[in-house]
Regions:
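Acidic beta-strand-loop-alpha-helix segment within the catalytic core
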Residues: 1-40, 133-134, 140, 146-171
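Conserved mixed alpha/beta catalytic, RNA-binding, or beta-rich assembly cores of soluble enzyme
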Residues: 1-9, 18-99
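Anaerobic metallocofactor- and corrinoid-dependent redox/one-carbon enzyme cores
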Residues: 63, 68, 80-172
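A general structural motif
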Residues: 11-13, 59, 120-122
């Protein structure tokens, strides 16, 4: 693994997080064959990517896999705010996808996009938990109030704010 070389560690000291999907079976086998550990998640790919920015706390060194473009852009925006790195490529594996890409003005169908290609300028990301996840608690309904947990990231300031909200019921 290139990451192990860059960090100056044995591949056995690297942990890759991968979304547990049939399309990733060959990728999981390849990472394991290289000697790295694999942790599989059933959902939460954006949170998984965010975890790579603090490997000392999360034990996750990199996130690998394919997914939808909107999630990729959201993850890139969060990584811009917290100082991570990310690369992505469009998967244009059908004639229809290639046609749609051409209609949107994409000329280089094999281009590798970096973090600033995916999320440029002063980026602000706000995410509120709906259901419990690894990154945020879900909405809690109490008799007189509703509790929420939100993360707000800003690239220009380099800040991450965790907001625990209390919303009184019955107000319009």
């Amino acid at each position: 693994l290139a990451l192990a070389r860059a960090k100056g560690v044995d591949p056995k000291q690297i942990t890759a997080l991968i979304l547990d999907r049939p399309r990733h079976a060959a990728l999981v086998a390849e990472v394991r064959a290289a000697g790295a550990a694999v942790r599989l998640i059933s959902d939460g790919d954006i949170a998984g990517i965010i975890f790579t920015a603090s490997p000392e706390e999360t034990g996750i060194d990199l996130y690998l896999g394919t997914g939808a473009a909107p999630e990729g852009v959201l993850a890139a925006a969060a990584m811009r705010c917290i100082g991570g790195q990310m690369q992505g490529r469009l998967i244009l594996d059908t004639p229809d996808r290639r046609r749609r890409a051409a209609e949107m003005g994409i000329e280089n169908l094999d281009r590798k996009y970096d973090l600033t290609d995916l999320a440029s300028g002063d980026v602000i990301v706000a995410a509120t938990g709906i259901t419990d996840g690894a990154l945020l608690r879900g909405v809690r309904f109490r008799p007189d109030r509703i509790q929420t947990e939100t993360l707000v990231y800003r690239s220009e300031a380099g800040t991450v704010r965790r907001i625990l909200g209390e919303h009184r019921r019955g107000l319009t």
